From Swiss-Prot:
Protein name: Very long chain fatty acid elongase 5
Species the sequence originates in: Homo sapiens (Human)
Keywords: Acetylation, Cell projection, Disease variant, Endoplasmic reticulum, Fatty acid biosynthesis, Fatty acid metabolism, Lipid biosynthesis, Lipid metabolism, Membrane, Neurodegeneration, Phosphoprotein, Spinocerebellar ataxia, Transferase, Transmembrane, Transmembrane helix
EC number: 2.3.1.199
GO biological process: alpha-linolenic acid metabolic process; fatty acid elongation, monounsaturated fatty acid; fatty acid elongation, polyunsaturated fatty acid; fatty acid elongation, saturated fatty acid; linoleic acid metabolic process; long-chain fatty acid biosynthetic process; long-chain fatty-acyl-CoA biosynthetic process; positive regulation of fatty acid biosynthetic process
Amino acid sequence: MEHFDASLSTYFKALLGPRDTRVKGWFLLDNYIPTFICSVIYLLIVWLGPKYMRNKQPFSCRGILVVYNLGLTLLSLYMFCELVTGVWEGKYNFFCQGTRTAGESDMKIIRVLWWYYFSKLIEFMDTFFFILRKNNHQITVLHVYHHASMLNIWWFVMNWVPCGHSYFGATLNSFIHVLMYSYYGLSSVPSMRPYLWWKKYITQGQLLQFVLTIIQTSCGVIWPCTFPLGWLYFQIGYMISLIALFTNFYIQTYNKKGASRRKDHLKDHQNGSMAAVNGHTNSFSPLENNVKPRKLRKD
């Protein structure tokens, strides 16, 4: 295993250049194998979990879901606030920011982004709860792709570009996750569900963050600095893939629901019209419709 890890490190160095020494020795960052193994285990559970649960009763998980979602809400809020203050203190340039230009503020950003990387491992539990509750319809290609890819991408980010221009997408995503996990936490309480109206807008917010991230990343391409261009091109490509998948999800989830509701409304309207026609042709008593019969003349 050590030989394989050494070969892998040599390959990564040849492809991406030397690693950032500031994260040397940090938990899970020294070699890629633990992150890769966690991802493989995740995909195996996604595949085998629903099969295991097929003939079993779903678990409620209500109590642990409240705690889990509250924990991720607080962690996301912490990361968002720390990233905003770190960027402000380091006087980060919106258009392009290198990885070694802000001193201690860079280290603050690196520490927070390690938590962001680690949170992607914690978020595997999203899928496991879907499996335990037998909500298999929520385990979509988008869901699995997003969860599995983010952990791996951020291992590479933390080892090569752990600060600088990398902050923007993580900052926006942390803010969106404050809204998202607070929604999930509240929706775990049945009495709160009628008051939760903003799920649709969370998806819109996610799409907006991808667009804003592409714009901000493109600034680094147009007005380059010491931040490696290859990472910027990769991020733009990845954001485009997420926009495509999230847009498809949004159309499938909300536009089709709206079309279905309009169809049901039209059907009800047509049924109402037919009832009126049938009431006439089947000679219903006019008294049933609150219409007084006219007296017949006797001439």
